[in-house]
């Protein structure tokens, strides 16, 4: 600050005087303030001194009081020390006593723990034994329950077997009666129709085939279709052609739907005009009836020209009108039988038996593909008429002609004894009639050179397709149709050559409900699963429904059925030499059949139904080749075994095991 004052320069003495005067005033004010502070400090110090003196006096007094208190506490301390010593002595004695008692309790506790450990070990052993006993008991209970379940399943299987045997016997009896009535009706129809011999001339082959088909449609309507009857046939019959009696078909489910004709049905059947296809309705038709009913291609009644075709007689018109009125009665009985057959299939369906589907009924009965039949030997001397254009076109695919075919297979015709194939339900009947011949999409003609017949005589049981999901199908009555694919492929089954005892071997195998054995002397009906698609899945009319063959070789077989095989050791026995001679005579009239048209109802039904699954979808299909015209099946060769190039399909499991698996899943 002094340096600052030295550095200050004044411009004039007055400024310097004013400056120092100001500083003097400041120093004087500071001195006055300092004096006031000093006086105040002195006064506060005096007051503080007085307070300290008072406090010192109070502290002296308090110190005296504390000394007296210390003396009193010392006395009390001595007193409590004596008391403490006495209590300590008492505590020591008590502690020693408690220690002795605690030692005693510890020893007792150790003994108790040892005893408890022994008890626990014994308890563990007992519990272990109890668990072992409980486990053994549960095991025995499970075995007992399993044995009861197996016993129950076996009892159910036995009950189902008894029911199936009863139903099978009943259906066979009904079938036998129906066949007898059909035979009577066929005889009456053969006698009822008498064709006038007028207007005899050389007939046109195209018209002959059309006339034959129209008659076949009429007969199919009479027997199977609930639709309106066809127009009375104006044409004549040609070389009769039908289907041979299938040896295993008598045990299949198809025949179970043939109703037992009531008296009204008999009366109506006596008035129905005869057509060549009616000769296929009976197995007991004699050769005289066949010759009288069908005639021969060379007879004057069959050699009319198109211009000389006689019109339907008034008596025949009356018969058709009567048939139109009374036809529903027979179908009522038919549907009753079909309902009972469905009930039987539903019972079998509850057991979840694996069913092998029939994908195309054309491969089961040869519908619309080829027709084979055995006829009476009276038609062995007949000659086939000239083939028309359609038959020739169909026969060109197989490198032969209808004339050559008729020469190779004489004696086959529609008038041969066969079976009636009935559809299931009214909605599945195929409308037939002469009007259906104008429709396109015709199946193959039955005049193919690969056409073969393995049926023997009309008094044998009829074969069915292998794998038909019929609860009444037995292992000894499998279809011989599947054997035709092996003939087309030119192969011979190595496991069945010369096997005469196929029936006996097949029934010795364990069978599922689809293979329940039945007596071989009676017929076996087929399930509706077979003949149900017969009306809907094939583009054929009534003629194709009757064209059922035991071993029809179909080159265009459905893909879903070409892999099917007949179980080894099953099927009808091989043909004898006499049977072959009968086949050779029965194929003369084969070339007289014409193409079968497709009706509109068939196309609708076929569109509604999808293709059926094949049980051999992953298997290579055997190549189907047309058999040579002159080839014949050897006498020792079976006709019911299919040839496979891969592993054959597995045999269905027994129903008891399947039912057991279904219960386990539930």
UniProtKB/Swiss-Prot annotation:
GO MF, one annotated term: microtubule binding
Where mainly found? cytoplasm
Q: Where are the transmembrane segments?
A: none
Q: Where in the cell is it found?
A: Cytoplasm, Cytoskeleton
UniProt entry keywords in alphabetical sequence: Coiled coil, Cytoplasm, Cytoskeleton, Microtubule, Transport
Q: Does the keyword Ion transport apply?
A: no
Q: Which Gene Ontology biological process is one annotated for this entry?
A: microtubule nucleation
**Pfam families of this UniProt entry?**
NUDE_C
Stretches of the chain forming a coiled coil according to its record: 14-195
Query: Where is the sequence biased in composition, kind Low complexity?
Result: 275-287, 372-383, 449-465, 473-485, 536-554
Any one of the GO CC terms: kinetochore
Q: Fetch the InterPro entries from UniProt.
A: NUDE, NUDE_dom
Q: Where is this region: Disordered?
A: 40-64, 220-310, 369-388, 397-666
Q: Where is the signal peptide?
A: none
Q: Where is the composition biased (Polar residues)?
A: 251-274, 400-410, 587-599, 614-638
Role: Required for nuclear migration.
How this chain assembles, per its entry, is: Self-associates. Interacts with PAC1.
The family line of this record is: Belongs to the nudE family.
Q: What is this protein called?
A: Nuclear distribution protein nudE homolog 1
Gene label: NDE1
């Amino acid at each position: 600050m002094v340096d600052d004052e030295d550095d200050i320069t004044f411009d004039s003495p007055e400024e310097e005087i004013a400056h120092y005067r100001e500083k003097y005033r400041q120093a004087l004010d500071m001195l006055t303030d300092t004096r006031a502070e000093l006086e105040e400090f002195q006064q506060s110090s005096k007051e503080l001194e007085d307070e300290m003196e008072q406090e010192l006096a109070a502290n002296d007094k308090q110190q005296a009081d504390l000394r007296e208190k210390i003396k009193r506490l010392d006395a009390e301390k001595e007193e409590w020390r004596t008391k403490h010593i006495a209590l300590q002595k008492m505590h020591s004695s008590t502690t020693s006593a408690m220690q002795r008692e605690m030692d005693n309790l510890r020893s007792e506790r150790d003994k108790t723990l040892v005893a408890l450990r022994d008890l626990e070990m014994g308890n563990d052993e007992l519990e272990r034994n109890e668990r072992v006993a409980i486990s053994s008991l549960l095991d025995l209970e499970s075995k007992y329950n399993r044995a009861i379940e197996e016993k129950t399943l076996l009892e159910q299987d036995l009950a189902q077997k008894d029911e199936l045997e009863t139903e099978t016997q009943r259906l066979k009896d009904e079938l036998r009666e129906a066949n007898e009535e059909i035979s009577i009706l066929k005889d009456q129809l053969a006698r009822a129709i008498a064709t006038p011999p007028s207007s005899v001339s050389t007939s046109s082959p195209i018209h002959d085939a059309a006339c034959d088909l129209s008659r076949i449609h009429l007969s199919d309507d009479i027997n199977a279709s609930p639709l309106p009857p066809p127009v009375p046939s104006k044409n004549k019959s040609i070389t009769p052609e039908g289907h041979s009696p299938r040896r295993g078909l008598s045990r299949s489910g198809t025949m179970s739907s043939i109703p037992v004709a009531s008296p009204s049905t008999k009366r109506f059947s006596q008035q129905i005009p005869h057509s060549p296809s009616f000769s296929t309705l009976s197995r007991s038709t004699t050769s005289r009836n066949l010759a009288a009913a069908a005639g021969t291609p060379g007879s004057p009644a069959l050699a009319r020209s198109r211009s000389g075709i006689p019109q339907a007689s008034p008596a025949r018109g009356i018969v058709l009108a009567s048939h139109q009125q009374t036809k529903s009665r027979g179908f009522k009985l038919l549907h009753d039988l079909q309902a009972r057959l469905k009930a039987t299939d539903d019972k079998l369906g509850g057991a979840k038996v694996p069913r092998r589907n029939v994908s195309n009924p054309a491969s089961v009965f040869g519908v619309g593909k080829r027709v084979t039949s055995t006829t009476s030997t009276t038609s062995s001397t007949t000659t086939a008429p000239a083939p028309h254009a359609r038959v020739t076109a169909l026969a060109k695919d197989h490198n032969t002609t209808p004339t050559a075919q008729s020469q190779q297979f004489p004696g086959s015709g529609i008038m041969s004894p066969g079976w009636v194939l009935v559809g299931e339900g009214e909605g599945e009947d195929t409308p037939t009639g002469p009007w259906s011949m104008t429709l396109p999409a015709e199946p193959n003609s039955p005049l193919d050179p690969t056409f073969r017949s393995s049926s023997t005589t009309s008094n044998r049981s009829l074969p069915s397709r292998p794998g038909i999901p019929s609860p009444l199908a037995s292992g000894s009555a499998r279809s011989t149709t599947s054997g035709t694919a092996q003939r087309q492929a030119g192969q011979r089954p190595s496991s069945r050559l010369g096997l005469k005892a196929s029936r006996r071997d097949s029934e010795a195998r364990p069978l599922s409900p689809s293979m329940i054995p039945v007596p071989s002397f009676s017929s076996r009906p087929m399930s509706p699963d077979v003949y149900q698609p017969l009306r809907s899945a094939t583009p054929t009319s009534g003629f194709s429904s009757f064209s059922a063959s035991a071993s029809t070789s179909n080159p265009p077989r459905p893909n879903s059925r070409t892999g099917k095989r007949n179980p080894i050791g099953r099927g009808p026995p091989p043909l004898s030499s006499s049977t072959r001679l009968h086949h050779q005579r029965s194929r003369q009239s084969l070339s007289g059949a014409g193409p079968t048209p497709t009706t509109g109802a068939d196309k609708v039904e076929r569109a509604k139904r999808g293709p059926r699954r094949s049980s051999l979808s992953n298997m290579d299909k055997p190549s189907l080749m047309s058999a040579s015209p002159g080839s014949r099946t050897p006498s020792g060769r079976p006709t019911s075994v299919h040839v496979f190039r891969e592993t054959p399909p597995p045999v269905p499991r027994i129903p008891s095991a399947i039912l057991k698996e279904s219960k386990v899943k539930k």
